[in-house]
C-alpha cells in the first residue's frame, strides 16, 4: 500500500521525522497537504510530514489520512477544522485544535458527510463541537479524545452530534467538558464503552429508535442519559453517577416506549430514574431490570400516575425515598416483581430468597412534597419528618399505596445480581 508525504512541494515517499513539541511545531503549508490529499488514490495511506497545518482541510476521496501522532490540524479559531466528505475514508492519529465558536455553523473538530468512514485515535482539543455527523450512515468513530472549549454550559458545543444518521458505531471515546452527546432522528446507532465527563447530557437521544448504549461511564454530568420521544432503545451495563444539574437525573425517559434498561449502576443523583409519560405508545411496555439504583434522593420518580413499566430484579439501596409519584396517584399501574429493597421488613422462612410477605411502599402525610411542588424545597425538614413519623405511628388519614412487590428478593439469595460489570474510573 503506497505511503505518501509532502516534501519540497512534491508527493514522495518519506520516513516520518521525530515529533516536535507543541511550542516548536513548524507551521507547514496547508495547500500542499490539501493537494496531497486530493492526489491520493482510493486506499492510499497519506502520511503528512510532522508539523502544524492550518485548517480547514477536506477529505473527498476514500484515502487513509494518518498523522502518526505527529501532525496537528489547527483551525485558528475559525470554522470547522477537518471535513470528511466522502465514503470509505479513514482519518487517524491526528491532533485537531482550535475550531471556531459559531453555533449556527456548528464549528467542529471533524465534520462527517459520508458513509462507512473510520475516524479513530484522534485528539481533539479546544473545538466547539467534537464531531458532527449529518445524514451519514455506517461510520465508525472510535478511540478518540475530545476536550471542549472553556465556555459556560449553554455556549458549549456537543462532543458528538448525530443528526439523521443511522447505524453508526461510536466506541471507546472520551468526551470531556462538552455540552451533550446527542442523537437526533437517528436509528440503529451503537454508543459503546465511552467515557463522558462534565457535560450537560451524557447522552441525549431524541425522536430516534433502536439505539444501543452499552458499557459507558458517565461522571459529573447534569443528566446522565435522557431518552425523549424514542422507541426501542436499549440502555445496558452503564455506570452513571453524580448527575449534578438542576434536575440531577441518572436516567430519564420522556414519552419513550419499548425501552429496555438493564444491568446499569444509577447512583448518587437526585433521581435514579425519572419516568415522564413513558411508555407513550399504546400497547407498549418499558422493561427496567437488573439495575442497581442506589444512594439517590429518589430511586424512581414518576411525573404522574402512569402505567406499563415493568421493574424486575432491581436493587434499591441507600435511597432516601424509594419511589415518588408527583401530583397524586401511585405507581401501582406498573409491575414490580422480584426486586431487592433495603428497607424490606419481612422474613424468608422458606429460605428461598423471596420474602414471605409483599413489600409495600406507602405515601404518608410527610410526603406532601410529592403533591405540592412548592414544598419540595422542604423535603427532609424536621417538621415534615415529624409529621411523617406521627402519621405512620397513628395514621389520621388513609396512606396511599404507592407500589407493591409481591416477591421481594432478600440478601441471602446469592443468585441475585444487579448493576453493571464496569470498573469505575476517576
Task: Give short role names for the model-derived ranges.
Residues 20-58:
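Acidic Gly/Asp/Thr-rich repetitive segments characteristic of extracellular carbohydrate-active
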Residues 38-39, 53-64, 73-117, 129-135, ...:
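Extracellular beta-strand-rich solenoid/capping regions of secreted or surface-exposed proteins
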Residues 246, 250, 273-281, 287, ...:
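Functionally critical loop-and-helix segments that line ligand-binding/catalytic clefts
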Residues 2-11:
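Bacterial N-terminal signal peptides
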Residues 43-45, 50, 56, 62, ...:
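Detector for repetitive beta-architecture
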Residues 75-83, 103-111, 126-129, 133, ...:
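Extracellular beta-strand/beta-solenoid scaffold signature
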Residues 47, 58, 66, 74, ...:
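Extracellular beta-strand solenoid repeats
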Amino acid at each position: 500500500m503506497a505511503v505518501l508525504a509532502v516534501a519540497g512541494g512534491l508527493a514522495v515517499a518519506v520516513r516520518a521525522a521525530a515529533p516536535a513539541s507543541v511550542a516548536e511545531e513548524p507551521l507547514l503549508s496547508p495547500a500542499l497537504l490539501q493537494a496531497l490529499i486530493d492526489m491520493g488514490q482510493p486506499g492510499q495511506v497519506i502520511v503528512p510530514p510532522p508539523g502544524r497545518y492550518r485548517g480547514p482541510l477536506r477529505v473527498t476521496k476514500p484515502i487513509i489520512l494518518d498523522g502518526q501522532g505527529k501532525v496537528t490540524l489547527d483551525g485558528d479559531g475559525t470554522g470547522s477544522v477537518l471535513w470528511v466528505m466522502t465514503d470509505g475514508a479513514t482519518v487517524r492519529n491526528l491532533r485537531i485544535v482550535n475550531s471556531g465558536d459559531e453555533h449556527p455553523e456548528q464549528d467542529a473538530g471533524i465534520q462527517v458527510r459520508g458513509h462507512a468512514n473510520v475516524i479513530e485515535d484522534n485528539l481533539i482539543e479546544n473545538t466547539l463541537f467534537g464531531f458532527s455527523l449529518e445524514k451519514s450512515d455506517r461510520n465508525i468513530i472510535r478511540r478518540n479524545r475530545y476536550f471542549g472549549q472553556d465556555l459556560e454550559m449553554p455556549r458549549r458545543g456537543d462532543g458528538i452530534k448525530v443528526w439523521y444518521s443511522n447505524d453508526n458505531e461510536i466506541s471507546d471515546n472520551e468526551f470531556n467538558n462538552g455540552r451533550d452527546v446527542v442523537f437526533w432522528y437517528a436509528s440503529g446507532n451503537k454508543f459503546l464503552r465511552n467515557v463522558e465527563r462534565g457535560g450537560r447530557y451524557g447522552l441525549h437521544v431524541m425522536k430516534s429508535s433502536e439505539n444501543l448504549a452499552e458499557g459507558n461511564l458517565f461522571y459529573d454530568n447534569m443528566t446522565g442519559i435522557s431518552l425523549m420521544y424514542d422507541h426501542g432503545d436499549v440502555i445496558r451495563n452503564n455506570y452513571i453517577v453524580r448527575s449534578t444539574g438542576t434536575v440531577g437525573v441518572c436516567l430519564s425517559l420522556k414519552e419513550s416506549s419499548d425501552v429496555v434498561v438493564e444491568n446499569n449502576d444509577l447512583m448518587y443523583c437526585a433521581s435514579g430514574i425519572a419516568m415522564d409519560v413513558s411508555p407513550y405508545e399504546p400497547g407498549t411496555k418499558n422493561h427496567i431490570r437488573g439495575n442497581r439504583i442506589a444512594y439517590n434522593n429518589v430511586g424512581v420518580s414518576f411525573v404522574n400516575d402512569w402505567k406499563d413499566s415493568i421493574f424486575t430484579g432491581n436493587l434499591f439501596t441507600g435511597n432516601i425515598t424509594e419511589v415518588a409519584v408527583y401530583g397524586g396517584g401511585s405507581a401501582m399501574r406498573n409491575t414490580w416483581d422480584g426486586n431487592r429493597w433495603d428497607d424490606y421488613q419481612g422474613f424468608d422462612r422458606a429460605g428461598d430468597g423471596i420474602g414471605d410477605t409483599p413489600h409495600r411502599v406507602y405515601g404518608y402525610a410527610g410526603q406532601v412534597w410529592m403533591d405540592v411542588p412548592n414544598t419540595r424545597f422542604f423535603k427532609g425538614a424536621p417538621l415534615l419528618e415529624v409529621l411523617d413519623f406521627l402519621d405512620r405511628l397513628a395514621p389520621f388519614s388513609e396512606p396511599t399505596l404507592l407500589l407493591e412487590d409481591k416477591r421481594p428478593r432478600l440478601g441471602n439469595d446469592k443468585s441475585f445480581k444487579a448493576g453493571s460489570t464496569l470498573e469505575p474510573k476517576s
